[in-house]
């Protein structure tokens, strides 16, 4: 099948992309409005950008009317956010939080999640997540869209603090088996941590022997 993206609708492109780019990690993001309301929302258009400095990027799609979502607006106005890793223990609550509440209502309270103070940033963290990345906003870039109207806001954050549960921290890294992370697939499907295998990176000398 050969398909030209320019001849497809936004929905058709979206379906192909989320079915082809997977599994995708989930960033469960808390932000805070100027009024002090804590917003929480999951995003799977998310990944690491650089390790030095530690930067992460999240694409936050715009609302149907073209205005920024709470996460992007709060991030730009307050300049901070917290990313929570989604695992098998908290994924149900994360899914509940995706309901589109008005800005003056908190998804944290609606989903029955527990706010705890963050170490460095003013935005609260959530106790239900065993790995948390506290971030300062580096940039918010409007991207995509047609006719001059952006389709999303690309939120770039610099990690200023890692909060990792003691039982997950192993040899300077993360024990993935103990974490049991959850990823997004296509449609309403999610992926669990399952079968893995390792491959040593080849060297030029090995390949020429």
UniProtKB/Swiss-Prot annotation:
SUPFAM superfamilies attached to this UniProt entry: FMN-binding split barrel
Lineage: Bacteria, Bacillati, Bacillota, Bacilli, Bacillales
Cofactor: FMN
This protein's UniProt keywords: Flavoprotein, FMN
Record protein name field: Uncharacterized protein BH2278
PANTHER family cross-referenced by the UniProt entry: FLAVIN REDUCTASE LIKE DOMAIN-CONTAINING PROTEIN, FLAVOPROTEIN OXYGENASE
Domain of life: Bacteria
InterPro entries given in the database record: Flavin_Rdtase-like_dom, Split_barrel_FMN-bd
Family stated for the protein in its record: Belongs to the flavoredoxin family.
Keyword Transport tagged: no
Pfam families linked: Flavin_Reduct (PF01613)
One term of GO molecular function: oxidoreductase activity, acting on the CH-NH group of donors, NAD or NADP as acceptor
């Amino acid at each position: 099948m050969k398909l030209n993206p320019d001849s497809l609708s936004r929905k058709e492109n979206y379906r192909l992309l989320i079915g082809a780019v997977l599994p995708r990690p989930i960033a469960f993001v808390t932000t805070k409005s100027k009024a002090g309301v804590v917003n929480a929302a999951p995003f799977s258009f998310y990944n690491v950008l650089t390790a030095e400095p530690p930067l992460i990027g999240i694409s936050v799609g715009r609302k149907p009317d073209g205005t920024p979502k709470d996460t992007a607006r709060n991030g730009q106005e307050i300049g901070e956010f917290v990313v929570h890793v989604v695992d098998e223990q908290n994924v149900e609550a994360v899914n509940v939080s995706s309901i589109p509440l008005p800005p003056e209502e908190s998804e944290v309270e609606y989903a029955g999640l527990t706010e705890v103070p963050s170490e460095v940033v003013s935005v609260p963290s959530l106790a239900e997540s065993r790995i948390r990345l506290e971030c300062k906003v580096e940039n918010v870039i409007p991207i995509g869209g047609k006719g001059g109207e952006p389709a999303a806001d690309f939120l770039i954050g610099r990690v200023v603090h890692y909060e990792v549960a003691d039982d997950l921290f192993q040899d300077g890294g993360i024990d993935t088996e103990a974490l049991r992370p959850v990823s997004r697939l296509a449609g309403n499907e999610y992926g669990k941590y399952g079968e893995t295998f390792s491959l040593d990176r080849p060297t030029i000398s090995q390949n020429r022997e």
